[in-house]
Amino acid sequence: MVIVAVLAAGRGTRMKSSLPKVLHPLGGRSLVGWVLHQVQSLQPQRQFVIIGYGGDAVRAALADQPQLEFVEQRQQLGTGHAVQQLLPYLKDYEGHLLVLNGDVPLLRGQTLAHLIEVHQNHNNAATILTAQIPNPQGYGRVICDSQNMLKQIIEDRDCTTAQKQNCRINAGVYCFHWPQLAAVLPHLQSNNDQQEYYLTDAVNALSPVMAVDVEDYEEILGVNDRVQLAAAYQVLQNRIKKAWMQAGVTLIDPASITIEDTVELAPDVVIEPQTHLRGQTRIGSGSIIGPGTLIENSVIGERVTARYAVITDSEIGEDTQVGPFAHIRQQSVVADHCRIGNFVELKKARLGSDTKASHLSYLGDATLGDRVNIGAGTITANYDGVRKHPTHIGSGTKTGANSVLVAPVTLGNNVTVAAGSTVTADVPDNALVIARCRQVVKPNWEPEA
């Protein structure tokens, strides 16, 4: 078993933000949220998050993860000082500690598992994750022997010309045998330019220490500013989209499409350009989504087409057409074989099967039965200035163009609403309702001067 500590105390001044750096969003999760997400596959014995700047905000953002234990680093005096804060919490612990940075969001769970496995199999005092990168300028170098045993960690400015040819860098991820680390932590010194306590000094004080290379150096990319945040987002998106294409999903122009990690796509889904899929979204087989569509926290059935549409927190049934320029939101449910056409908005609406609202309509707080046809320009007037009211429309009912249904109101089954009507009272089954003034034509009309 292993205990995990995530360092999340830094301010991140280069982000130029009041938001703590580790809480900046990246494709559906915060930076630290991604780190903790990958940790779950390790099934750690305990999980510590070391907080400092914006600690209350970090606690609040992670409040849905009750397994986390928060430890405060009141003064941010370096990575070694951060890990020192664990000493009172792990007095009798004899196992291993995995130390991660909360601003390195792209690490994979299997990479961490491999690091722990190597560490335990070799009975190391410490095992560090390293990477071979094409341009290591500015990074500290990790010098090892032929068996990957650590000889030295050297800052870039202190490297000789020969040492600068070494492209192996420290990723800042460590697995320690805790009793050995705990013995050296109290003796760390801050005699450096930053007057901080470095965890690398603890590594240099331990033996044996082994280095393990990560297979893909992009995994260890950190985020210190908005440019690096954007770069990390591109790596994450490429990873997600490649996996979906290999799973049988067609992406037309992948560079213009974004898909969050929490989205689920069935085989034979087609995603058109400029489409964005977010949150807990699921899309059924054979559906064609886009171009120009945003879907968030919604369930889309099989063989749905949605073009130039915004769909949030809703459900769309099979063989339904949505768009162009439709907006479906707030727990709307659309059954199978429906059509939601151009410039139609649904809000908290439930539509039965084979129901059509083809153009220029607003249906809010409304329940529609099967085979309903909503004429162009029909709206439900659901708000009286104080509260929202429901509209109920029975199966087989048809509304004429430019109708207004003033809620609360109920239309029965097979009702026909004449075009231009303003309906303010309930209508029984099989009725025709005409709620408009009779047209008056006055020939040869000459207005008074």
Curated annotation (Swiss-Prot):
Molecular function per GO: glucosamine-1-phosphate N-acetyltransferase activity; magnesium ion binding; structural constituent of carboxysome shell; UDP-N-acetylglucosamine diphosphorylase activity
Chain positions recorded as Mg(2+) binding sites: D103, N224
Compartments in which it is found: Cytoplasm
GO CC entries: carboxysome; cytoplasm; membrane
Catalytic residue list: H359 (proton acceptor)
Domain of life: Bacteria
Pathway(s) the chain acts in: Nucleotide-sugar biosynthesis; UDP-N-acetyl-alpha-D-glucosamine biosynthesis; N-acetyl-alpha-D-glucosamine 1-phosphate from alpha-D-glucosamine 6-phosphate (route II): step 2/2; Nucleotide-sugar biosynthesis; UDP-N-acetyl-alpha-D-glucosamine biosynthesis; UDP-N-acetyl-alpha-D-glucosamine from N-acetyl-alpha-D-glucosamine 1-phosphate: step 1/1; Bacterial outer membrane biogenesis; LPS lipid A biosynthesis
Catalyzed reactions: alpha-D-glucosamine 1-phosphate + acetyl-CoA = N-acetyl-alpha-D-glucosamine 1-phosphate + CoA + H(+); N-acetyl-alpha-D-glucosamine 1-phosphate + UTP + H(+) = UDP-N-acetyl-alpha-D-glucosamine + diphosphate
Co-factor requirement: Mg(2+)
Keywords of this entry: Acyltransferase, Cell shape, Cell wall biogenesis/degradation, Cytoplasm, Magnesium, Metal-binding, Multifunctional enzyme, Nucleotidyltransferase, Peptidoglycan synthesis, Repeat, Transferase
GO biological process: cell morphogenesis; cell wall organization; lipid A biosynthetic process; peptidoglycan biosynthetic process; regulation of cell shape; UDP-N-acetylglucosamine biosynthetic process
The enzyme's E.C. designation: 2.7.7.23, 2.3.1.157
Enzyme class: transferase
Predominant cellular place of this UniProt entry's protein: cytoplasm
UniProt-annotated stretches for the region N-acetyltransferase: 248-449
Cofactor note: Binds 1 Mg(2+) ion per subunit.
InterPro entries: Bifunctional_GlmU (IPR005882), GlmU-like (IPR050065), GlmU_C_LbH (IPR038009), Hexapep (IPR001451), MobA-like_NTP_Trfase (IPR025877), Nucleotide-diphossugar_trans (IPR029044), Trimer_LpxA-like_sf (IPR011004)
Record-given protein name: Bifunctional protein GlmU
Gene name for this UniProt entry: glmU
